[in-house]
A protein has these predicted regions:
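Conserved beta-alpha structural segments and adjacent helices that either
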Residues: 1-497
Length: 497
């Protein structure tokens, strides 16, 4: 599948009656290029959602997507950054980014346009607050609008903001006379709201270190910071649902006491179903947008759901006194099905939507009910043999390979992970005879340049690929694996509890 050509999916005749597409032969590193084609063609009337197997791939995908199509909107819906049934809440930044993404998703449904929603297997398994409940918590105002400062301060406290004397960190707010300072997650700078009575007079950004004004703003939009807002209605709903699920609370039930008093409790998000009459899924928020599955997502969904069930059962054993830590603060877990989908439910939701698309590096067999599209993108050449050989110059072999590709009329892009590593790599290749190298920052420049030029870019791909009209030679293909060691997790229930 050439990089610079269309997939040919704009017409329904290209798909037949099938709404399930499998694109096979998608080599590692080509996913972002394929996503852009999908977003531009089948997503022409709205966004597409891409589910990746783990969150570590998201940042790399975002970087490559910005190279392939800088103007394509990309939205990231992260998962909670804590374990299932944990005693701690998800981080404030992760929660705020989730809610900001859901609010943006709601706007995309109202005014559809091509965009890519990146999310993970962990994120799609977990249920979410209803769309209407999130929309009710969004606050926006301009200078001259009527806005009750005391009501705003109360809403900030209920939403998880910490009241302080001087705002310096994200998630803090302060009130001094007719001035309210707040630092919202996701904001580049904190804001200073100046009130005259119930009228918002001005909005100014300021430096949290010096407290000095850095500029003015025409508007501020405050997204919810937490998936739980301790309003009187929500507290009442929690109390009713808690008693219905667990029976009358005991005196030592710290969770029930804290929520009843309107105080936030560490880890209360793990009882999210008790705060709402009904939770939504990611697919409810997304509507009928096409859903694209990364390779191995099903395995990631199964692994995560197994972890959810394991941790739930560990909490039950703890409550029954059969587990180390049983003398700790009581923990009454909600059933997994109230907070999480199963892998099969995720599959059903995806298939019930507008279209399901699977990406795989392998060949896919023809099966009734789905359309197979052959990407025919191959993994790039590895220079492992040249690295191991003592009588071969590695970089001369790379230069020779690139020369052969250019002679065949192929466009070549040399990719590295950082500016520094790219500069060093190009310097060495130049010393070994590579000529006409031009650094680029977007794919359109690669397309516009003549084929006799070799382009180079910072690109977060593990390995290169051959897409026919473009060959990417990656830093890792030449120099070998990067020396990054990731700590291994050991799943021990007693450590979790």
């Amino acid at each position: 599948m050439p990089v610079f050509s269309k997939l040919g999916l704009k017409s329904s005749s290209a798909l037949g009656a099938n709404r399930h597409i499998v694109i096979d032969g998608v080599a590692d590193g080509y996913e972002a290029f394929c996503l852009i084609r999908l977003a531009e063609e089948i997503g022409e009337r709205g966004p597409i959602m891409y589910i990746v197997r783990d969150g570590q791939r998201i940042a790399d995908l975002e970087q490559v997507l910005s190279f392939v199509a800088p103007d394509m909107p990309v939205l990231h819906l992260p998962a909670w950054d804590c374990l299932p049934y944990d005693r701690v809440s998800p981080g404030a930044d992760a929660s705020a980014r989730r809610l900001a993404a859901l609010s943006a998703l709601s706007q995309l449904k109202k005014a559809p346009h091509p965009a890519i929603i990146l999310t993970t297997a962990n994120a799609v398994l977990q249920k979410l607050p209803p769309e209407a409940a999130i929309a009710e918590q969004v606050i926006s105002a301009r200078p001259g609008n009527q806005l009750d400062m005391n009501d705003l301060a109360s809403r900030l406290e209920r939403n998880g903001f910490e009241r302080v004397s001087t705002v310096r960190d994200i998630g803090e707010f302060a009130v001094r006379g007719g001035i309210l300072d707040l630092y919202a997650p996701g904001a580049e700078e904190p804001l200073r709201l100046d009130f005259f009575g119930d009228t918002l007079e001005s909005i100014r950004a300021f430096d949290p270190a010096t407290q000095r004004t850095t500029g003015t703003r025409k508007e501020f939009v405050l997204q919810p910071m937490s998936e739980i807002t301790l309003s009187p209605d929500m507290i009442s709903r929690f109390r009713k649902n808690y008693v219905a699920m667990f029976g009358a609370p005991q005196r030592d039930d710290a969770l029930y006491q804290a929520i009843s008093e309107g105080r936030r409790f560490a880890g209360m998000e793990h009882w999210l179903p008790l705060f709402y009459d009904k939770l939504d899924t990611v697919f409810d928020h997304a509507g009928n947008m096409p859903v694209v599955f990364d390779h191995l997502v099903h395995e990631a969904l199964t692994e995560r759901h197994t972890m959810v069930v394991d941790h739930y059962e560990a909490r039950l054993r703890q409550a029954e006194g059969k587990e180390p830590g049983s003398d700790a603060v009581p923990y009454k877990p909600v059933k997994p099905e109230t907070l999480y989908l199963t892998p099969s439910e995720v599959e059903k939701h995806a298939e019930a939507g507008g279209m399901r698309i699977d990406l795989t590096p392998f060949g896919a067999p023809e099966v009734t009910g789905r359309t197979i599209i052959h990407a025919d993108v191959h993994k790039g050449r590895s220079f492992a043999e040249e690295r191991a050989a003592t009588d071969v110059n590695l970089f001369e072999a790379v230069v020779k390979h690139i020369a052969e590709l250019r002679a065949a009329g192929r466009k070549v892009l040399v990719a590295a992970w950082t500016e520094g590593s790219l500069d060093r790599l190009l310097q060495v290749l130049d010393e070994h005879g590579l000529e006409k190298i031009e650094s680029v920052d977007r794919l359109s420049t690669v397309k516009a340049l003549s084929r006799d030029k070799v382009t180079a870019a910072v690109l977060a791909v593990e390995s290169g690929f051959d897409a026919g009209d473009l060959v990417i030679v990656a830093e890792q293909d030449i120099l070998g694996d990067r020396l990054i060691r990731r700590s291994k997790r050991r799943k021990r229930d007693q450590d979790f509890i």
